[in-house]
Amino acid sequence: MKRDITQLLSPELSQSSSRNDKKRKPTNSNKKVQTVLNFPSSSPNASQSTTCPTCGMTYYSHVSKDNDVHNKYHFNFINGIPWPTSFCNNVLERFIVVDHTTGKAKGTSKSKKSQAASKETLVMTIDRRASKQVKRVEEILKVVNGELNAASDGKAWQKDHKGPIQGRAFIVVIDGRAIGICTTEPIQDVDQQCRWIIHRTQALVPNQVNRSIKLGISRIWIAPKWRRYGLARRLLDIVLVHSVYGIVLDKKEIGFSQPSFSGGLLAKSFNGVTHKSGEILIPVYLEE
């Protein structure tokens, strides 16, 4: 029986029962929850939370502090997370991206002509021994997982692995902000991990092992402002070149983990193959 790929690639704990059990003793939890006291308000919706349709953050719009937190998170989500110059010590490639922006003249309803600005773009890896860099990558991944509605990754990019292929975190930086990320994971057990999915249905192909995969793409993400510039595809090409010292990986040696709809389109264009049935297959792997 076919199952959804997200169930197979990113299993989650089943939800606990919502039934009230008066005999059950309350348990302690270390999870921090923001609490807002519900005082009477002239606004009928004052006690209701708001979820931003763009960044996905849930907050209380009538609370000034919540608004400030949301505004900061929203800006970083759209434009990228701050990335200090001191973190840019392992730059792999530099290139130019032409940023097309439109503005509106003050006092008029007419839009200005598109203005193009050349932006130097850096792609780098992090120093895993630098705790501040590791922490910043973890912050970025929280944003990524939040948008993808994905569980936390296996942190393979932080670990040392046997063999020539290591997990890495590749960062794309423009104007001092991390606007893209790709984390990778070396395959440990081909038979247990490597599969194919049907792009149209996202169902696993039964009883098939993809023995070509050597490196998994755990997460790949570009900040919304910088999408449709071809950066995700370019980032994958850089991963091929810089994942194994002295060797350029082939596209068929790359597998994807839990691809979202947009991620599935990226994977399809990058290394999808057409089966004799006419279905397009995407190489995937199961995260350990």
From Swiss-Prot:
A zinc finger (CCHH-type) spans 50-74. GO terms for cellular component: chromatin; nucleus. GO terms for biological process: mitotic sister chromatid cohesion. CDD domains: NAT_SF. Residues 7-18 have a biased composition (Low complexity). Pfam families: Acetyltransf_13, zf-C2H2_3. Belongs to the acetyltransferase family. ECO subfamily. This is N-acetyltransferase ECO1. It comes from Debaryomyces hansenii (strain ATCC 36239 / CBS 767 / BCRC 21394 / JCM 1990 / NBRC 0083 / IGC 2968) (Yeast).
